[in-house]
């Protein structure tokens, strides 16, 4: 898979910008807040129809404008592919593949695959459960595009159920409607739980292997999916039964708090180093190592499932890693993955490495191609 060009219109701080990618490695260099991360975010959005930085399309649109466009040309296993997205909060998204509008997000997802790694990913260890759930969901959206419909169906059931909970105690309570939404929550929630659990089972050995390399085999990493619903033997039948029982048990407290307390929207992912919680006990260096292992595992898994090399998006990551881990990451990248990376300076990159890369200077939403010598002068 190779991203050949990208065109942004009124996306974040880009008024109108086209970029042609001419090498397997592209370095976006520039001061902070110039738009380097925004370009990577646009590529990530094409891969997942989500951003790890915001949940609102409105935030992606340049101030003073009503819509934004992202267009990309790529080559996948020798076949050219054109992708286009229009974002307009007033009327929704318009998705196009090879010039044809697609109605279902599942028909757009999976056309471009990318793994994003930024300094914000340290929150995977120390942040809230929602960050870890969203990480799993973004991976699943690429591996199984129909997962997007499953998430939407579950979220609709959750919204409707919460709306009913806010009416609890008032006249006109509809028990039949309540049970109907409970059933939808259980059926679709079970499917989400099983897919997330399977994803963890596939990621775990890959992450463990990478973590052994990165830590010098001094620590053992374990991953676990921590569900509010007892998983039992992991079958759909067992989870449905446990989910239904949990809803019945928590009914009184849910009526009191007027929100849904059971389901995959409350679940978490556990990371342990030598059987101790990484969130509670890992040092900052250990957290960086853990996250790098997770991202390398994600990269390997996406490649193995989709049968093609995903794009690698590195947002100011090298500054967060020591020299040993920088070296491992750069070695893994090699020429195998098309890589877009951002940096404020070129010092971490050896001269031969820079000579093989396309170097782009980003200044206030404008991108210019520069030679290695010019880039060093501006550094």
Swiss-Prot record:
Q: Which GO terms describe its biological process?
A: DNA replication; DNA synthesis involved in DNA repair; double-strand break repair; SOS response
Entries under Pfam families matching the protein: SMC_N
> Where ATP is bound, by residue?
30-37
- UniProt keyword terms in alphabetical order: ATP-binding, Cytoplasm, DNA damage, DNA repair, DNA replication, DNA-binding, Nucleotide-binding, SOS response
Q: Does the keyword ATP-binding apply?
A: yes
Where is this protein primarily located?
cytoplasm
Compartments where found: Cytoplasm
User: Would you tell me the Gene Ontology cellular component terms?
Assistant: cytoplasm
The question of whether Transcription is a record keyword is answered with: no
User: Which cysteines does the record link by disulfide bonds?
Assistant: none
Superkingdom of the organism of origin: Bacteria
Q: What GO MF terms are annotated?
A: ATP binding; single-stranded DNA binding
Which InterPro entries does the entry link to?
DNA-binding_RecF, DNA-binding_RecF_CS, P-loop_NTPase, RecF/RecN/SMC_N, RecF_2
Summarizing the function annotation, the protein's role is: The RecF protein is involved in DNA metabolism; it is required for DNA replication and normal SOS inducibility. RecF binds preferentially to single-stranded, linear DNA. It also seems to bind ATP.
Q: Which family does it belong to?
A: Belongs to the RecF family.
Q: What name is this protein filed under?
A: DNA replication and repair protein RecF
| Annotated organism of origin | Thermosynechococcus vestitus (strain NIES-2133 / IAM M-273 / BP-1)
Q: Encoded by which gene? A: recF
């Amino acid at each position: 898979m190779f991203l050949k060009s990208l065109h942004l219109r009124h996306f974040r701080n880009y008024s109108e910008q086209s970029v042609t990618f001419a090498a397997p490695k592209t370095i976006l260099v520039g001061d902070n807040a110039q738009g380097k991360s925004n370009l990577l975010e646009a590529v990530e959005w094409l891969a997942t129809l989500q951003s790890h930085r915001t949940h609102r399309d409105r935030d992606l649109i340049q101030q003073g404008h009503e819509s934004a466009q992202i267009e990309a040309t790529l080559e996948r296993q020798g076949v050219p592919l054109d992708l286009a997205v229009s974002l307009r909060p007033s009327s929704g998204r318009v998705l196009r593949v090879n010039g044809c509008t697609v109605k279902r997000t599942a028909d757009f997802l999976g056309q471009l695959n990318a793994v994003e790694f930024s300094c914000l990913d340290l929150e995977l260890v120390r942040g809230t459960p929602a960050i870890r759930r969203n990480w799993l969901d973004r991976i699943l959206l690429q591996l199984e595009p129909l997962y997007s419909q499953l998430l939407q169906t579950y979220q609709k059931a959750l919204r409707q159920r919460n709306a009913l909970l806010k009416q609890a105690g008032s006249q006109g309570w509809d028990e039949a409607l309540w049970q109907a939404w409970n059933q939808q929550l259980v059926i679709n929630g079970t499917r989400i739980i099983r897919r997330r659990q399977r994803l963890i089972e596939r990621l775990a050995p890959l992450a463990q292997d990478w973590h052994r390399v990165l830590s010098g085999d001094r620590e053992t990493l374990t991953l676990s999916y921590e569900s509010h619903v007892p998983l039992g033997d992991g079958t759909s039948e067992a989870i449905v039964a446990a989910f239904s029982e949990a809803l019945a048990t928590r009914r009184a407290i849910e009526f009191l708090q007027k929100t849904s307390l059971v389901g995959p929207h409350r679940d978490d992912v556990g990371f342990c180093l030598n059987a101790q919680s990484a969130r509670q006990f890992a040092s900052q260096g250990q957290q960086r190592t853990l996250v790098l292992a997770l991202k390398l595992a994600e990269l390997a898994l996406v490649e193995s499932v989709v049968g093609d090399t995903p794009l690698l998006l590195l947002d100011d990551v090298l500054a967060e890693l020591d020299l040993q881990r920088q070296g491992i990451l750069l070695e893994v990248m090699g020429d195998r993955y098309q890589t877009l990376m951002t940096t404020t300076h070129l010092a971490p990159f050896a001269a031969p490495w820079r000579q093989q890369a396309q170097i782009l200077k980003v200044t206030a939403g404008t991108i210019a191609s520069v030679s290695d010598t010019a880039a060093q002068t501006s550094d």
